[in-house]
């Protein structure tokens, strides 16, 4: 996960073998693969534009990677039928890609990447061209396929909601470096730096100085002069400069009970969003 130009797709292309690393080594199941050509790495790939062969039927598209690997005809028939069933497209084998909807084409692309039992599947923003409802539906579908067959999926996206929905672990990229690698909840609750805090979810940030610290609380004096009690993530000592992060959903407007961090403010704008209201 990361903004445009952060190095996500370059990283994926190195894993696939389409880019050559300038330093280091890539290991797959403990074996170095940097000098192995892409077609011999045994890695499945799903692109944003699907890359289906338009002159082949759905069955032939799925059979192609198996024929290249010299699989027998009987095994090809079984594997293709199993892969189509996995993506809920049984009975679509004789259709041409042009006869399918965008969501169906995407499922064929996923099935083709899985049909030869790869050890890893790489997905490069595969849902970017779909509308919102179909994209959300496909997120759950890919997640369920992953859970049912247990294959490792490396999935590139700039959509943080998509990353939080689908992932066991998320690597946040910026400027070619991994800023944080952790579970979705840890990424959201305990960002390691201000970039991750501001990139994941929405955030209000305040600069200040730590004036007191204990094991699970610290007091920060903001540049405005207000004092805030906060969770000390990566805070080491009194006197250091820090940034306080406040998620919008954690703010309570006009609380009925007395509580910490109670401050006066002025509402400038109220925006209705259907299932929630934004207050600025």
Q: What positions do the PLM features span?
A:
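Conserved coupling/switch loops of ABC nucleotide-binding domains, chiefly the family-specific signature
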Residues: 22-25, 75, 175, 207
């Amino acid at each position: 996960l990361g903004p445009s130009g952060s190095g996500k797709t370059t990283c994926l292309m190195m894993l696939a073998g389409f880019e050559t690393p300038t330093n280091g080594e890539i290991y797959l199941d403990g074996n170095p693969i940097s000098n192995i050509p892409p077609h011999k790495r045994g890695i499945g790939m799903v692109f944003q534009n699907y890359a289906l062969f338009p002159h082949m039927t759905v069955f032939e598209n799925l059979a192609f990677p198996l024929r290249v690997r010299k699989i027998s005809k009987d095994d090809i028939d079984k594997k293709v039928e199993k892969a189509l069933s996995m993506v809920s497209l049984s009975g679509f084998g004789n259709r041409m890609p042009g006869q399918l909807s965008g969501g169906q084409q995407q499922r064929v692309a996923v099935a083709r990447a899985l049909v030869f039992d790869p050890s890893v599947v790489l997905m490069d923003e595969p849902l970017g061209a779909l509308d919102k409802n179909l994209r959300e539906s496909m997120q759950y579908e890919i997640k369920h396929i992953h859970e049912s067959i247990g294959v490792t999926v490396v999935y590139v996206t700039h959509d943080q909601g998509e990353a939080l929905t689908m992932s066991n672990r998320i690597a946040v990229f910026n400027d070619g470096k991994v800023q944080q690698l952790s579970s979705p909840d840890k990424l959201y609750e305990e960002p390691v730096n201000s970039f991750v805090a501001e990139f994941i979810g929405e955030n209000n940030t305040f600069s200040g100085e730590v004036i007191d610290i204990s094991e699970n609380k610290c007091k920060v004096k903001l540049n405005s002069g207000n004092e805030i009690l906060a969770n000390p993530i990566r805070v080491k000592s009194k006197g250091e400069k820090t940034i306080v992060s406040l998620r919008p959903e954690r703010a309570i407007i006009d609380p009925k009970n007395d509580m910490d961090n109670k401050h006066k403010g002025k509402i400038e704008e109220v925006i209705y969003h259907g299932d929630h209201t934004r207050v600025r």
